[in-house]
């Protein structure tokens, strides 16, 4: 009897062994089958059926195993804990010692020019100093005289961020990824460029800084050639790579990214200063989700005094990026839904667009979503294009308020465009054609140069970008407006009339004048056919809009012509009578509220009693 049991035991062992070998063979075939199934959808159902068979077989093996006598041949294995599933990093949080900066800042002179981020001040100027200051403004469009006298390694004073930012801790698992900092420059002032570099070295944890890559976009200033190369050798992790031909920001950043070795790319402009703890919150968010593109809270370094606008602990009004229908980037306060979502300043801000100058992104994700459009030239539009692409293709744009970086905002660019400023319109046409679907017509009505390029197909080949959109299975632009930026007012896709409003009595066009965001009087000006200040739309809601950037409406309150923010903003709103206009068959424009008509008097637009026989009340969209 005992012998029979032993024979049965041997048979069972053979059966278990055979079943296990067969199981391993099928499992190996299953792996290759799954790889094919991801590429061939018709195989997915077969793989699913195979999964069911494997489950049954595995169950049979387990049943045979469990029916066998149990032999205690080793000590019980300890229960695996959650922490042991990831042996590559330690539990808990990074300590301040672990996050020590790459370089400690040298002792500071509290009375030095611009110390602790304070403004540079000077009361008396010699003729030579005045000349130097003026030349600095002319060359760099900021006060290079002041910058040159402020320490390259100046401190920015105590950490004034909100307490929850100062006290924020960062988990070791998943570990914070290291970053390559990429800084593009073209004829940048020596002091602002090097202060940016030192700022990174003095505020970035050594374990997180892989390298700083300075990308020279064909600078012509001699001090940025061999002297710069010689200087940065002492900075250990800093290298210079160069474009021999001026190609602009986009290709320069692509060059920097191509040589970067870290997991994360961090792009900065060449006139920045980083505040306490600026990098860790950016990297922590990417460690959580590599499809998030993160920007710091960008504060102002005054272009005249180089005063650093420090963060405040309470009461800051946060902003996010937006765009208008001329595809210009801008800022706006957070909508109520975003304010309610955030519990404190450690919460990211969801942003429809980003400024594009300062941000961090996973290198692998940067490559996955198509880096930059390398057929865009110099700069202009690349940030809006990337904003649309990230959101529409499954990623997110966020601003991290606890990360603070200062930036010198200039009122104009000191650099020329080798191919003229037409490159901006060309870049914008490329992004409109790839990402905006039918909504691109709203943009083309506001930019006649871009519309002409689109008609003439003079914006280059976009086939690769269209293939990228298809390959990534990206959402359409309607989805972006509905889900990412529902606050965006969408003008009529096909307004009743649009263009310039020409007065037939004086042969001039209605014009809003310079920098008129409402409240300033309108004017009549020679018709120039360029849109801009002379662009108007008569909508299906019967309001008359100047909406290149903001949605501004003509109104005739108390018989006076004016311009103000439109009352009709979509759902749950309507056009008030003083913003409602009627275009008559006699070419009059009558206001529904006052009953008066738009007329020209002394070459100024005013409201007057309607008179169909007066040519100064005859208007035509051209």
From Swiss-Prot:
Residues of the region (Catalytic subdomain A) are 176-285
Note whether Transmembrane occurs among the keywords: yes
Could you tell me which residue ranges are on the Cytoplasmic side of the membrane? 1-8
**Lumenal side stretches:** 29-622
* Compositionally biased intervals (Basic and acidic residues): 119-135
Query: Which superkingdom heads the taxonomic lineage of this protein's source?
Result: Eukaryota
Spans annotated as Disordered: 103-135
- Its transmembrane ranges are 9-28
| Cofactor(s) the protein requires to work | Mn(2+)
* Pathway membership, UniProt: Protein modification; protein glycosylation
Q: Which segments carry the region annotation Catalytic subdomain B?
A: 348-410
Q: Which UniProt keywords apply?
A: Disulfide bond, Glycoprotein, Glycosyltransferase, Golgi apparatus, Lectin, Manganese, Membrane, Metal-binding, Signal-anchor, Transferase, Transmembrane, Transmembrane helix
Q: Which residues bind Mn(2+)?
A: 269, 271, 407
Q: Which residues form the signal peptide?
A: none
Q: How does it sit in the membrane?
A: Single-pass type II membrane protein
What S-S linkages are listed for this chain? 509-527, 553-566, 597-610
Q: What is known of its domains?
A: There are two conserved domains in the glycosyltransferase region: the N-terminal domain (domain A, also called GT1 motif), which is probably involved in manganese coordination and substrate binding and the C-terminal domain (domain B, also called Gal/GalNAc-T motif), which is probably involved in catalytic reaction and UDP-Gal binding. The ricin B-type lectin domain binds to GalNAc and contributes to the glycopeptide specificity.
Describe the family membership recorded for this protein in Swiss-Prot or TrEMBL.
Answer: Belongs to the glycosyltransferase 2 family. GalNAc-T subfamily.
Q: What does this protein do?
A: Catalyzes the initial reaction in O-linked oligosaccharide biosynthesis, the transfer of an N-acetyl-D-galactosamine residue to a serine or threonine residue on the protein receptor. May participate in synthesis of oncofetal fibronectin. Has activity toward MUC1A, MUC2, EA2 and fibronectin peptides.
Quote the protein name from its UniProt record: Polypeptide N-acetylgalactosaminyltransferase 6
| Source organism per UniProt | Bos taurus
For this protein's source organism, the top of the classification is: Eukaryota, Metazoa, Chordata, Craniata, Vertebrata
């Amino acid at each position: 009897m005992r012998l029979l049991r032993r024979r049965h035991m041997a048979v069972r062992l053979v059966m278990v062994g055979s079943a296990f070998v067969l199981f391993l063979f099928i499992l190996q075939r299953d792996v290759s089958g799954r790889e094919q199934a991801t590429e061939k959808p018709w195989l997915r159902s077969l793989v699913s059926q195979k999964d069911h068979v494997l489950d049954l077989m595995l169950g049979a093996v387990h049943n045979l195993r469990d029916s066998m006598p149990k032999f205690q041949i080793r000590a019980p294995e300890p229960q695996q804990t959650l922490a042991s599933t990831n042996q590559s990093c330690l539990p808990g949080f990074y300590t301040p010692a672990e996050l020590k900066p790459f370089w400690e800042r040298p002792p500071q002179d509290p009375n030095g020019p611009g110390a602790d981020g304070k403004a540079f001040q000077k009361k008396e100027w010699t003729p030579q100093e005045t000349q130097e200051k003026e030349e600095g403004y002319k060359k760099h469009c900021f006060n290079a005289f002041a910058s040159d006298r402020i320490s390259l390694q100046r401190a920015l004073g105590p950490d004034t961020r909100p307490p929850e930012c100062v006290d924020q801790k960062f988990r070791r698992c998943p570990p914070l990824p290291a970053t390559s900092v990429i800084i593009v420059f073209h004829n940048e002032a020596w002091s602002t460029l090097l202060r940016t570099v030192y700022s990174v070295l003095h505020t970035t944890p050594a374990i997180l800084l892989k390298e700083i890559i300075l990308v020279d976009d064909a600078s012509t200033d001699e001090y940025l050639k061999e002297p710069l190369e010689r200087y940065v050798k002492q900075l250990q992790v800093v290298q210079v790579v160069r474009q021999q031909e001026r190609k602009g920001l986009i290709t320069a950043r692509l060059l920097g990214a191509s040589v970067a070795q870290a997991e994360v790319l961090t792009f900065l402009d060449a006139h920045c200063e980083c505040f306490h703890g600026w990098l860790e919150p950016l990297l922590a968010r990417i460690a959580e989700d590599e499809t998030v593109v993160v920007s710091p809270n960008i504060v102002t370094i005054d272009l005249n005094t180089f005063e650093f606008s420090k963060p405040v602990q309470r009461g800051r009004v946060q902003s996010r990026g937006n765009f208008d229908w001329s595809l210009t980037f801008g800022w706006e306060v957070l909508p109520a839904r975003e304010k309610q979502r955030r519990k404190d300043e450690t919460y990211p801000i969801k942003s429809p667009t980003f400024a594009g100058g300062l941000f961090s992104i996973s290198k692998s994700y940067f490559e996955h979503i198509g880096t930059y459009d390398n057929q865009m030239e110099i700069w202009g539009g690349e940030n809006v294009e990337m904003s649309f692409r990230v959101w529409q293709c499954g990623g997110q744009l966020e601003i991290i308020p606890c990360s603070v970086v200062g930036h010198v905002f200039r009122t104009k660019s000191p650099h020329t465009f080798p191919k003229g400023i037409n490159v901006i319109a060309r870049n914008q046409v490329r992004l409109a054609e790839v990402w905006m679907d039918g909504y691109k017509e709203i943009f083309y009505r506001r930019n006649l140069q871009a519309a002409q390029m689109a008609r003439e197909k003079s914006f280059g080949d976009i086939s690769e970008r269209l293939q990228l959109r298809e390959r990534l299975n990206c959402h359409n632009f309607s989805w972006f407006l509905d889900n990412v930026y529902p606050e965006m007012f969408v003008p009529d896709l096909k307004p009743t009339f649009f263009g310039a409003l020409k007065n037939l009595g004086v042969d001039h066009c209605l014009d809003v004048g310079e920098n008129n965001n409402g409240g300033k009087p309108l004017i009549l000006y020679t018709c120039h056919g360029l849109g801009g200040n002379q662009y108007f739309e008569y909508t299906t809601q019967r309001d008359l809009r100047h909406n290149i950037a903001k949605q501004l409406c003509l109104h005739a309150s108390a018989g006076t012509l004016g311009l103000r923010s439109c009352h009709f903003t979509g759902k749950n709103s309507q056009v008030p009578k003083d913003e409602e206009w009627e275009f008559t068959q006699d070419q009059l424009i009558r206001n529904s509220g006052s009953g008066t008509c738009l007329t020209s008097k002394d070459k100024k637009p005013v409201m007057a009693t309607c008179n169909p026989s007066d040519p100064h009340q005859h208007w035509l969209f051209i």
